[in-house]
């Protein structure tokens, strides 16, 4: 969603461990010389509107100083490949500031996202 956040180490560790156990989740990490420069977190699920399985990018982030180098595109293309192996008919993503990035990769704007903090 192109927002800044601060990772709480304990929460990250438990969430990451749980994600690694899930069949419907995928995490990619982009590294350069041992440094993490980006990541993608995605899932898939069944949906009526897609008449089957949909994969969605929950989070995609690339370090500001590494943007424009194809890192995000490479991770997104790899995610699309995973989605195909899962028989997904669509890949979806919500974004606020990266619309031009997704449009350049043939994604189309289809909805407005709402949220409610619980």
Predicted feature residues:
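Residue-level detection of beta-strand scaffold positions
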Residues: 1, 62, 79-83, 88-89
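Acetyl-CoA-dependent GNAT
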Residues: 1-51, 58, 117
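Alpha-helical elements of Rossmann-like donor-binding domains used by nucleotide-donor carbohydrate transfer enzymes
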Residues: 14-15, 35, 74, 78, ...
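Conserved acetyl-CoA binding element of GNAT-fold acetyltransferases
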Residues: 52-64, 112-115
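Conserved acetyl-CoA-binding loop-helix of GNAT-fold acetyltransferases
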Residues: 62, 68-81, 104
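Conserved active-site alpha-helix within GNAT-family acetyltransferase domains
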Residues: 73, 85, 89-91, 95-118
